[in-house]
A protein has these predicted regions:
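Repetitive helical segments and hydrophobic/amphipathic motifs
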Residues: 11-13
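Sec-dependent signal peptide recognition
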Residues: 1-9
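Conserved alpha-helical scaffold segments that buttress catalytic/binding sites
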Residues: 21-206
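Sec/Tat signal peptide C-region and signal peptidase I cleavage site
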Residues: 15-19
Length: 206
């Protein structure tokens, strides 16, 4: 299971005023963006497999060295009583609620840098778009992943973790995108580690 450490974001500005602000550690154990149980067959209970990302965030927090940053945890529900696709996104309404909760933390603390420990790939969306809003044109995103995560609602795979980069670009489900504080131009996104095979619609977008 891929446990994405969304190093969302050591976006550094040349403007020295931001150097006075602090780095925070954001524990973001969101799992609803993934739909992975069918691939994790070694876990007998599919619900436990689905929630594996939640445990992954706790493990990363335990393993990552403590550098003295303030630490905040985004409240994430572990309820899995009903998973449903809404407007092309699995568990959309839960993701919207948790997106708001993450943004509330950032808007109150106003960090200059964020170390995000997740969680599936979509935990990068809130930190990156927060930093894009804070630094305006002085920020870029390096996406290190085997997948480009440029899926859109309506594609064959409805899980939001595969839509993370398109969400950062301001594309995707309107209810989610409307919560995000900024978008990142495709010209400021660098992909590293992308595999050389993808579904046809992904190849076209790349």
């Amino acid at each position: 299971m891929k446990l994405k450490m969304a190093i969302a974001a050591l976006a550094l500005s040349t403007n020295s005023i931001y150097a006075q602000n602090e780095t925070i550690r954001l524990i973001y154990p969101q799992w609803q963006g993934g739909d992975i149980a069918k691939w994790i067959t070694e876990v007998p209970n599919p619900d436990d497999a689905s929630r594996g990302y939640y445990l992954g965030a706790q493990l990363l927090n335990f393993l990552a060295p403590d550098s003295g940053q303030k630490t905040f945890t985004v409240p994430i529900t572990t309820d899995i009583s009903e998973r449903k696709v809404t407007d092309g996104v699995l568990d959309r309404d839960i993701i919207v609620k948790q997106t708001k909760a993450a943004l509330d933390i950032l808007n109150i603390e106003k960090p200059s840098k964020i170390v995000t420990l997740g969680g599936e790939c979509s935990v990068s969306v809130v930190p990156f778009t927060y930093l894009a809003n804070k630094y305006k044109d002085d920020v870029a995103m390096i996406w290190i992943d085997a997948h480009p995560d440029i899926t859109l609602p309506g594609d064959v795979y409805p899980a939001y973790h595969a839509m993370a980069v398109t969400a950062c670009m301001g594309l995707g489900n309107d209810k989610i995108i409307s919560e995000l504080p900024a978008k990142i131009s495709p010209s400021k996104i660098l992909f590293v580690g992308i595999r050389d095979w993808e579904r046809e619609e992904i190849k076209t977008r790349q």
